[in-house]
């Protein structure tokens, strides 16, 4: 819940000086990206900008305090301020900020700018007291904000010092409007107008000018001169002499003498007590000060000119001038030290009654009241956890003694979830074990089950599925139905474990249950996770169309609940890319993989490994080996600079081994094979993939017998567990083994099985990646004209993809190849005596690749009649009469030159 006063522009008071010369300068602010108003405290920054902002409807105001260094809090208020300015135009950004569903401030701001692109009128955001921001992450995000904000957007920043916002760069590019302390200082004319408004009897212009010079035009000093003259009935000049040369750091003594000592005891105590509040309203004042009518008292203090300012148009919320408020809080610690804890307790109680638990925690911490802090956490901690107030919760839990946590074990559970959210897995188990050992008496069974649910999540995250399954089952056996969050966690973990064990149907059922529970209780990140898992399971079962439809539901959930910034969004677009790749929709697959990288742009580069692997796959399927090599260099660099889950490594190794196969790099394959781990099992698609990598490397090295043993065992497991997509992949690799080892009949048999299974999976690229060996077999099958209709159609589609992407098949017949061929000792005499032209060599390569006459004409951009002439000439030179004879002749030439066809 946001405090309204932090989003309210200060109210302009009737007696406030209107700074016409400065307002004239600010009137051109819409021509700049940033309007920066800087000066020490008390120079009238806020007053000036509030005057300028008066009458501007499309302006948001955000007043900072020390608590705004928390990124999530800063984001929530900033977006809320822009929502006020735009009348709710940026609803997606608002929802993401409220639910903490963004990867970083930068990514949230990027979404904000997408929405603001549809806002075409001038728009302003004022951020007051920016000097309170010390968090470098926020500084970095605001630099990003300034670089990318729309042209019709002006950011107005008020600060006591020069903020870390790339000011020099903006200044050089003339995108910065600056007002500093020298300009904010009152000149002689303004000082005269000021005193004429504040003093009962006018003073001479020369006297006014002298006083202005004495205090260097400092607005706070001028205000104190007028206040002192009214309270003490002394001359203004006397006060001016006392303030001459003084600055904010030496003001305390003066304020004691001239302000606090000149009000009655009741007012003095009111000022000191109320100063502990960063913002205040009637209810807070009544509780903190004991005054019966807080609103009336605030208005009275305001009339006395005691540096109190209204924070909203309704006059409900007030705050002290920062300089005066800081002074009062310091004096309160000295004068009311004994009462201070009780004052903070009263403030905490009032904030709780008004529904602001985070503000209440601030005062409970200041009071040092562990019992009050504990009670607030017991009632509100999980709500704060779900809104990602993690830093505040961590600070609060550290302030509680361990004994208090043991007496309230749910707070121990909260602390453990905090650790889990920060990936401190070993600390989670240590904390829970210690708590179980030291909790007095018999531990509540439900709480123990909640501990086990969390432990199960930690175990699966840490790569220990057996322990995760044991703990998840224990938790589900003991958890009441009402304990929905822990039941969702345990059900999800159990489903994930079964997925790892290859029990796909039962895993799918549990993930569907998880989705239903998570949707019912609005636990959206688990709902999304369960959909992603369902899609992976359906893909493994070979039901790729069902996987696609599940992904569509997941994308819809992301859109409805504004989950675009969650890292899980990358997981979803990645598995969508895998599916698109399988169906040979390579451009879409690449775009999806790149969008996954964009989601992770604010994370460590190592997180992008999986999407980078997919980019390599796309290049390999296109036959673009140069691009694949470039991407592999980056991938291998990431592999060497991080620790990864085994399935991440398996996917990365897959594209490396395929690249070595396509380039004939046996040395790299042999080196990898010596060092790569060999899993004990192959009962899920992760482990099947790693064993398939091993078999592919063995085939490349000519180790056909061990590769066949591996693949036969993989197929047995895949059939047993219904891992149909893996079976399809295994059959294709087995086909390559048989083909290369000369077992043509076996190769044809398993290829037919693979084509039949592809009717279910829809696989295309898995065939294409095998290149020319696959193309040659498919040509033979098509020529036999015995394939069923669906398999015939798929074979033709695969062949077209190979012909389109794998240009190296006829690139062999380039000038360099032809020159080497003609110099080969075994070249047929007919070719040596009647050499083909370069164009005829190109035509032969395209015939060999399965192109029709029309396709060859299109490829070479010549007329079909010209192609017929080229074909007639090359047939005559080769001594062949039919197209199939030409194909066989080309194949013999390639074999002679050492190409494995």
From Swiss-Prot:
**What's a Pfam family in this record?**
GerE
* SMART domains, alphabetized: HTH_LUXR (SM00421)
Which keywords accompany this UniProt record? Activator, ATP-binding, Carbohydrate metabolism, DNA-binding, Nucleotide-binding, Transcription, Transcription regulation
Instruction: Name the CDD domains on file.
Output: LuxR_C_like
Q: Where is the HTH luxR-type domain?
A: 829-894
Q: Which residues bind DNA?
A: 853-872
| Gene Ontology biological process terms in this record | positive regulation of carbohydrate metabolic process; positive regulation of DNA-templated transcription
Positions of ATP binding: 39-46
InterPro entries per UniProt: P-loop_NTPase, Sig_transdc_resp-reg_C-effctor, TPR-like_helical_dom_sf, TPR_MalT, Tscrpt_reg_HTH_MalT, Tscrpt_reg_LuxR_C, WH-like_DNA-bd_sf
MF terms from GO for this chain are: ATP binding; DNA binding; DNA-binding transcription factor activity
- Coiled-coil segments on the chain, per record: none
Q: Which SUPFAM superfamilies match?
A: C-terminal effector domain of the bipartite response regulators, P-loop containing nucleoside triphosphate hydrolases, TPR-like
Q: How is its activity regulated?
A: Activated by ATP and maltotriose, which are both required for DNA binding.
Superkingdom, taxonomy of origin? Bacteria
* Complexes and interactors: Monomer in solution. Oligomerizes to an active state in the presence of the positive effectors ATP and maltotriose.
Q: What does this protein do?
A: Positively regulates the transcription of the maltose regulon whose gene products are responsible for uptake and catabolism of malto-oligosaccharides. Specifically binds to the promoter region of its target genes, recognizing a short DNA motif called the MalT box.
NCBIfam families, alphabetically? PRK04841.1 (NF003420)
By sequence similarity, the record places it as follows: Belongs to the MalT family.
Protein name, per record: HTH-type transcriptional regulator MalT
Q: Which organism is it from?
A: Salmonella gallinarum (strain 287/91 / NCTC 13346)
